[in-house]
């Protein structure tokens, strides 16, 4: 079992660590160093049908993704703005031992229905952090938090490397800032796990929630109202 986590190195730069255990309940033993070539936050690992494994990751602002636009860390890096294409999450294939990358991470392109990149100014659709990938109907579903607008949205691709075409919202806003999530299949049903601060009545102290998600005949995820009947 492999537990992936972000942590800052001695220079204050986020990297990805990995800890290994013989049991999902632990104890997990961390590797002595971070994964070479890793950066930013919010790792999510997807294992494809052929057994190949991939890490998706990234987050802007506090997640430092904007500092890596040149491929090297720039402490003065600023995220794109206005009509410029928004930053996309990163993808890297994992080595067979699950402890490293086979190559340098690549940026994932998220585009609209016309094939145009989602602009940085479109905070309803642009990537912010907390990505996840699952596979349904032979297609790859990339879901992520929009951050400031508090949506979980998704984009779809025929190729794991992208580009991913924006489709719409999975979850309307919940209380508690961003909505880091995961999507899993269990007993022939699909479920969304996410967090929400409604129980605490604050914008922090979030609780874990889950709800079933459904797809229409064309594979579109039906938008969820978290506080509806």
What role is predicted for each listed range?
Residues 1-229:
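Carbohydrate-active catalytic/glycan-binding domains of CAZyme proteins
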